[in-house]
Amino acid sequence: MNMKRINKRLNIRLLTALLGSLVLFSLGCTKKFSTINTDKNSIATVTPAVIPFLFSHAEDIATVNQANYQIAQNLFADQYAQYFGCEATYFGSDRLVINQAWVGANFNPYYTDVLPQLQTIFANTDSLSAEHAMAEVVWVLAFMKATDYWGPIPYFKAGIVADSVPYDPQDKIYADFFSRLDGAIAVLTPLAGSNAYGTNDLIYQGDVSHWIKFANTLRLRLALRVSNVEPTVAQTEAEASVAAGVMTTSPGDDGLIERSSVGGDINGLSTMSDWNEFRMSATMASVLKGYQDPRINQYFLPTFNSGDPTFGVFANYTGIRNGLTVAEQTIPQNLAVANSHQGQRWSSTNVTVGGTVVGEASYTNTPQNVIETAEAYFLRAEGALKGWNMGASAQSLYQAGITNSFAQWGVSATQAATYIASTATPIAPGSYTEDGTDTAVSNVPVAWSADPTMELRQIMTQKWLALYPDGMEAWADYRRSHVLPLYAVIHSDNPLITNTSTQYLRRIPFLLSEKETNGGAVAAAVSLLGNGYPDNEMTPLWWDTNPY
């Protein structure tokens, strides 16, 4: 990254901070709703020159920046999706305990640092402009993350100063998501080839053509999310997305947000490089090693104990089971030095194996995944299994998803072709288990099956691998489909989960801070969960129709 670009990013962050007094002045000093609600009727009028900086800040927070990453995502969704297992004895989240003081980091920032910025853009741009439409897409991206944790959230009246702000049901929120995306895509499509926000857009540098693909792929993601509860809507939105143009080529189409140590906005996973609190999960070890998946070299490092910095020696990669007790975490086999650290691109130069530095000086600047091309293909493959018009067969889309994921991570097309033809299945990872058993996490092969049930499992398994390290999306997929290859958590310290083979976390309960400051609205929101369900982590979201 050249100095001109670095200075540009620094200026973005400095100006955004200065704009806090301009835009965030409207934060309502309400007695309730955690004092984070804003009044959209008093949003400042700003000059056109300011708008791009507001967009940058909204993008930054909507994609979970480093300030919130660990406590918004890594301690929760990343472990629920079993990308990582926990090494730190002071965290209970891997044993399914939800710390309410942490998880608000995936709630409050959307109302304090995304909503006011985007509402200011809406109030100060033409509704038919690319700037306005791109802001609509970021809005959906942000609030999707919130509603997919909690279900009902303050939404339609968020931004209006009031003593109490009501929660809205998830089905209505998703309907608004589709409305916003449909409208944004309609505005952006005739503007293809133009530019909005320029380098202040941290994902595509203002390229509207790429934003059209991004918006359509996001719409396709949401369509599959609701496919079990609103199949007609899902098919309509999915087919419209594919017809209008989703991502097709990695890495060119991939949606990655820039991160930089300049301005303090580094990659969230990189932030944790030297803390040694998390390692590759046994689930990832079972699948990646069983498939002889070359992406393991990108996702993780050889164990420190191996003493061998050579990438690609599968025996040198090890993972830990999720849900270890404090005593089990201290067993030599489960120590951080005996299990695989996050990959090279997220590792500092303090990280060494066998005395060789395996980290990168630029690790803080590693772009952060938002939506990638491979996901678009796996979404289409799943839609094709349902009989939707996805433009190709489920098999060809599945294989294209693998090929594009390999391309994203710099693995050759030749290696992808060999992998696609492989009949390999996951293996026993050799990780600690309480009862001494050591079995493969699943029997799902890579090579396309003739069994439709197995085909869905294949699509979801490869999608799970391709989404790494986006635990938020992977956890949502698990709850929706229940076919991902996950081990039962070894121990639960959560009294609601007494059998981890049949029970799993399905949502985050409403925040205690919200119950204290917006209590009436939260009490009313419980009924929005439906079917008389209580406000706890075993209650399914609206789009999660799978029984345990």
Predicted regions and their residues:
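C-terminal functional modules
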Residues: 406-548
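Sec-dependent bacterial lipoprotein signal peptides
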Residues: 1-28
